[in-house]
Amino acid sequence: MLEGDLVSKMLRAVLQSHKNGVALPRLQGEYRSLTGDWIPFKQLGFPTLEAYLRSVPAVVRIETSRSGEITCYAMACTETARIAQLVARQRSSKRKTGRQVNCQMRVKKTMPFFLEGKPKATLRQPGFASNFSVGKKPNPAPLRDKGNSVGVKPDAEMSPYMLHTTLGNEAFKDIPVQRHVTMSTNNRFSPKASLQPPLQMHLSRTSTKEMSDNLNQTVEKPNVKPPASYTYKMDEVQNRIKEILNKHNNGIWISKLPHFYKELYKEDLNQGILQQFEHWPHICTVEKPCSGGQDLLLYPAKRKQLLRSELDTEKVPLSPLPGPKQTPPLKGCPTVMAGDFKEKVADLLVKYTSGLWASALPKAFEEMYKVKFPEDALKNLASLSDVCSIDYISGNPQKAILYAKLPLPTDKIQKDAGQAHGDNDIKAMVEQEYLQVEESIAESANTFMEDITVPPLMIPTEASPSVLVVELSNTNEVVIRYVGKDYSAAQELMEDEMKEYYSKNPKITPVQAVNVGQLLAVNAEEDAWLRAQVISTEENKIKVCYVDYGFSENVEKSKAYKLNPKFCSLSFQATKCKLAGLEVLSDDPDLVKVVESLTCGKIFAVEILDKADIPLVVLYDTSGEDDININATCLKAICDKSLEVHLQVDAMYTNVKVTNICSDGTLYCQVPCKGLNKLSDLLRKIEDYFHCKHMTSECFVSLPFCGKICLFHCKGKWLRVEITNVHSSRALDVQFLDSGTVTSVKVSELREIPPRFLQEMIAIPPQAIKCCLADLPQSIGMWTPDAVLWLRDSVLNCSDCSIKVTKVDETRGIAHVYLFTPKNFPDPHRSINRQITNADLWKHQKDVFLSAISSGADSPNSKNGNMPMSGNTGENFRKNLTDVIKKSMVDHTSAFSTEELPPPVHLSKPGEHMDVYVPVACHPGYFVIQPWQEIHKLEVLMEEMILYYSVSEERHIAVEKDQVYAAKVENKWHRVLLKGILTNGLVSVYELDYGKHELVNIRKVQPLVDMFRKLPFQAVTAQLAGVKCNQWSEEASMVFRNHVEKKPLVALVQTVIENANPWDRKVVVYLVDTSLPDTDTWIHDFMSEYLIELSKVN
């Protein structure tokens, strides 16, 4: 293939993986991340990259935005059209195309330092060693020699079914195009078969139960070796792994294996193979240490133990429950200690379930048994290995944790004793038989194994994975399939291999006899080959469930073939989930119908709340500008329509209560109706219920999530609220369903709706009607604080107002009304609409940007541009906080002096290390660091600011440049430095704890009270040491950002530049990424090499 054609194909593959296109400055980096090389546009005869791209219009579509930014998009072609089908293909006879669904969920980032960073254990600093770090990895010196610096972890971890060796069209089948497909649900097969939860599944041919029962139990089977991939040289890989393990008889961490593999064989070890080790007992033994963490230990295979297990008809476990890695006795140590001493040590360790430091053993031993501890015991810990498990820290024999060994089952002890006295000749004979069985499996790839073990389906680790909803019978058992590289894309590749295997092998014939529960390969419609399990059998037909798709079908026996074991290494892709918030109505036919119509055949982003056997999830439709909570939408869709308020145009309504007025002039009203009366009665019953019942833990909200409806006690009454945003485990935002008020509260202040009232409460629709004043002059423009204040003083919480409806906007959910007070009804010339336009309230003052006075004792609080003011959140909302506010936030216009600023944050001295987090990175010459040790304190402060300012009064302040304030940015309150005042009502601020520059509405700026001035400002401007460049290109800046932004790193301080203002301090540091197990990546070395490579290309 010509180089130009190859570059075009690789370029199309890169662009097809980015639905929203790739900005021109980022294209080189994206291309290199996939291919390892730059786009060689100069070698192809073009002076610039853009010139080359414009020369291949069949591959690239170029668009230029209004701001001048150039974005590249992929052009479709027949050769790569099937790439789009790699996303969760739903096999059925009828397919329909629908709107494309984007499931890149815009997750609300509430704790960037924890949710987006790595755990503290990744930083090799002794003060932050967690159980993970202690039990998992050695603790060497913080930094190693810089000559060993650059170690880059591959971004993409390949699936067992995503391996290829050619560069033709087939080579691009593993490039997933995710979250774009709407699948058909017309051809549903019934009866619906139950599918397994995502846990360990064993399927037996001898099973006689129905599918629904069969998939929820575990049947132990002999271990069979399923190949990870049949396009890969698996035998060679397995032999190499054997060689590595033989060199490490004491075991090796599974996370370190790829590093050793690459060092020895100069090749990358496919990441998918790491998941197959548990199914290779003839290659290795896998153990999980009890010291915590997710890493596993690998040992050379124990052939004789495996041998007994393979031939044992009683399915006895292979070995005792694995403990931590044990180190053999050290040379030169004394002989084994007395049995009574070991027995006492074993009894002592039983009392320490979390383990006991070896150094603490003598004292604990003497205190318990009142006898002297043997002097040489600690020098020979290995001799205690037969009575306890020993976990050496950092390979240091002087530092170890001792764990009590778990007792073996009685039948296992007896069996091992019998085996120990067995005849050597019998052992040799059985071992010979085992070798013959192993050889026969290797010789015949067509051999069908009657008993097959399929690995369990693992829940994706990413924050918001994508799922395709297949079908549901109730909301507690929704059949889904995960969409992604290791799931739907891997399955597509496997099915292509199945098609090739069964279509081109004439020796394979259909099954003659089948059993319920047996796994088969079925030739389905459109010449597709699918994995299926037998549910029932008839004379010439069998009923099967397609285990990767979740639906059932009757097929002819002539289309069913024995499933080759090599197609069993991929987990069954269809699984179940439970929709959060809908449990109480899970079987309601109306709810099931609504959920099915909104979800089946579509792809959604999913928030996994509880990773149980059947995960508890919230589905989000992210195809539009805003994320739509599907769970909440379905719940609102089944409300009792007879309890809704249906406003009629030109109708008059009296006794209307204005419950809320937002800062943009939007009103929320309550209109007397049947639903409001029923709600009042129900809330009174709940009040009596809580008054008579002792408050237990079941009444508190233990698992908050967006869209959940619960209760909040406000001004002596219980009110309905819906959670709209979860900031952290302590603080969240709620909206009062029946008044429209939005505020922030503590999780501990919420209560679950008692089960006996839950169904009735959910059925009542929200009673707050969103309105706006009709026929206001267009010249009014943006509402001024004075106009909002006048409207609040006039009608807020007035229960006998009247409205006349002029228009109902169904799409926006808002009614245009004329509003009247009791004195002025029904004269339209004296309506609130006319009065507010005649008043002198619309002059935008230059020096005052915020309303000055509260509207009275019952006046509520405002919250950002959409924060309503309601009696529900007035001064009595949280009395203790309001008292503090009144004392600390007095009326004044002068800014706080610099003497009231917190002390500067502590930085290490030049030449010393410190753990840091990088929240913002522009380029190596400018980025921001935060001390890792202070992040928890910052999290607590942010939560307190959310709760504090959500109930505080808006203050009349004259803001000044270069002064410190509190400002609300994206639903969070930050400590900011005001950098500039714009004429359009916005101000420019600098976040003093995160180092970001933002534009916010001036109404969201408040004084920073003393209680939030104690913690030093956390953001420190930094520059990368060890690299020189006067001007950084966008490409180099992006590479730098990708390696450091939102990551915890180790910083070696070179210079600290002090300044009187804490936000003007600067530090010059070396940055080191210590996340890899054996390599410290010095960022300045990496950037230097990158600049050299870039200069070669240019």
UniProtKB/Swiss-Prot annotation:
InterPro entries annotated for this entry?
Answer: LOTUS-like, OST-HTH/LOTUS_dom, SNase_OB-fold_sf, TDRD7_LOTUS_3, Tudor, Tudor_domain_containing, Tudor_TDRD7_rpt2, Tudor_TDRD7_rpt3
Question: Taking every annotated instance into account, which residue ranges of this chain make up the domain HTH OST-type?
Answer: 3-76, 233-302, 337-406
Q: Keywords of this protein's UniProt record, alphabetized?
A: Cataract, Cytoplasm, Differentiation, Disease variant, Phosphoprotein, Repeat, RNA-binding, Spermatogenesis
Can you give the residue ranges of the Tudor domain? Answer: 513-570, 703-760
GO MF term (any one): mRNA binding
- Choose one Gene Ontology CC annotation of this protein and give it: ribonucleoprotein granule
Disordered: annotated span: 129-156, 855-874
* Gene Ontology BP annotations: lens fiber cell differentiation; lens morphogenesis in camera-type eye; P granule organization; piRNA processing; post-transcriptional regulation of gene expression; spermatogenesis
Compartment(s): Cytoplasm
Q: What is its main location?
A: cytoplasm
Note down the stretches annotated as region Interaction with CABLES1: 893-1098
- The segment annotated Interaction with CDK17 runs over 861-1098
What are the Phosphoserine sites (modified residues) in this protein? 319, 859
Pfam families (UniProt xref):
OST-HTH (PF12872), TUDOR (PF00567)
The source's superkingdom equals: Eukaryota
Q: What does this protein do?
A: Component of specific cytoplasmic RNA granules involved in post-transcriptional regulation of specific genes: probably acts by binding to specific mRNAs and regulating their translation. Required for lens transparency during lens development, by regulating translation of genes such as CRYBB3 and HSPB1 in the developing lens. Also required during spermatogenesis.
Give the disease association: Cataract 36: An opacification of the crystalline lens of the eye becoming evident at birth. It frequently results in visual impairment or blindness. Opacities vary in morphology, are often confined to a portion of the lens, and may be static or progressive. In general, the more posteriorly located and dense an opacity, the greater the impact on visual function.
Q: How does it assemble?
A: Found in a mRNP complex, at least composed of TDRD1, TDRD6, TDRD7 and DDX4. Found in a complex containing CABLES1, CDK16 and CDK17. Interacts with CABLES1, CDK17 and PIWIL1.
Per the similarity annotation, which family is this? Belongs to the TDRD7 family.
Task: Supply the name of the protein.
Answer: Tudor domain-containing protein 7
- Native organism is Homo sapiens
The lineage, from the top, is:
Eukaryota, Metazoa, Chordata, Craniata, Vertebrata
User: Its encoding gene is what?
Assistant: TDRD7
